[in-house]
């Protein structure tokens, strides 16, 4: 992954700004926050960041892909203890990273997980990509209904069999794409209880919306440098940012901007 010049913005620093990402020639990332008058119609998203469990790379890539339509704030797990935290957001989002069953309890007590569940019951939305999709499952936040996020690489006829950064074929609303993948999940369960937006080549659901919960196994937010260093063999699959548009469309369907 790339190195970063600056530390991530705090929740308060992101309160009235839209963050713009600039990738330099060494594929290092710096954050440039521009004071912006936020439209009242923009939905408010709280994006969790705790590097490396929730990767800076993944979080900032989500900001880059979604900040045109959403007011995005960065938050830390301790802020879930604030009774007023959810009063100021429409979507809570969890990016990819290396978080797993061993690290999860270090950040999220049952009380914090229950607060997220109550937020959803009250009309809030959840967005999870890769690790964030795993965390929607029964071993973690337990917010999905009859759906289990499971490792795609262990599924029958999976096109990827090891955990590494690569691309894999998906069918996104009828269009074949080679999308960035790093040990993401398939969403296995009763398909009558969710809408499938995208599938892996073996037919397993890859991106779904169930009520106010949207989860994605691959990385449509992936920026150009993920396709270049160090995995240069996937350069030819760079999509010119088209997958960012797919992600934006997905989130707009999950939580419309107007």
What do these predicted ranges mean?
Residues 91-97, 213-217:
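Structural motif
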Residues 2-18, 24-29:
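Short, positively charged low-complexity motifs
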Residues 161-226:
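Catalytic beta-strand/loop cores that center a nucleophilic Ser/Cys/Thr
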Residues 48, 71-75, 127-129, 214-217:
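A structural signal for short, well-ordered beta-strand segments and their strand-loop junctions
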Residues 39-88:
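N-terminal beta1-alpha1 cap of cysteine-dependent amidohydrolase-like domains
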Residues 104-172:
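A glycine-rich, often tryptophan-bearing local segment used as a flexible ligand/cofactor-contacting loop or short
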Residues 100-102:
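Short glycine-rich, flexible loops that bind phosphorylated cofactors or substrates
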Residues 220-258:
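Extracellular ligand-binding/catalytic regions of CAZymes and related secreted enzymes
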């Amino acid at each position: 992954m790339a190195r970063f010049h600056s530390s991530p913005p705090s929740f308060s620093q992101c309160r009235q700004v839209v963050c713009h990402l600039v990738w330099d020639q060494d594929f290092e990332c710096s954050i440039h926050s521009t004071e912006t008058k936020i439209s009242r119609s923009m939905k408010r998203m709280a994006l969790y960041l705790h590097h490396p469990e929730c990767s800076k790379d993944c979080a900032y890539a989500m900001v880059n892909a979604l900040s045109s339509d959403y007011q995005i704030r960065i938050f830390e797990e301790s802020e879930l203890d604030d009774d007023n935290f959810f009063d100021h957001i429409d979507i809570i989002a969890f990016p990819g990273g290396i978080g797993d069953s061993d690290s999860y309890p270090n950040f999220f007590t049952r009380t914090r997980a229950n607060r997220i569940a109550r937020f959803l019951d009250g009309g809030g939305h959840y967005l999870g990509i890769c690790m964030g999709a795993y965390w929607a499952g029964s071993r973690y936040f337990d917010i999905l209904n009859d759906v289990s996020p499971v490792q795609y690489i262990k599924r029958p006829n999976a096109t990827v069999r090891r955990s590494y950064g690569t691309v894999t074929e998906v069918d996104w609303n009828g269009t074949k794409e080679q999308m960035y993948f790093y040990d993401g999940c398939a969403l296995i369960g009763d398909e009558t209880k969710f809408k499938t937006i995208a599938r892996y080549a073996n037919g397993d659901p890859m991106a779904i919306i169930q009520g106010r919960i949207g989860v994605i196994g691959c990385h449509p937010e992936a920026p150009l440098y993920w396709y270049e260093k160090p995995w240069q063999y996937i350069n030819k699959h760079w999509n010119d940012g088209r997958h960012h548009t797919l992600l934006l469309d997905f989130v707009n369907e999950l939580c419309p901007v107007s």
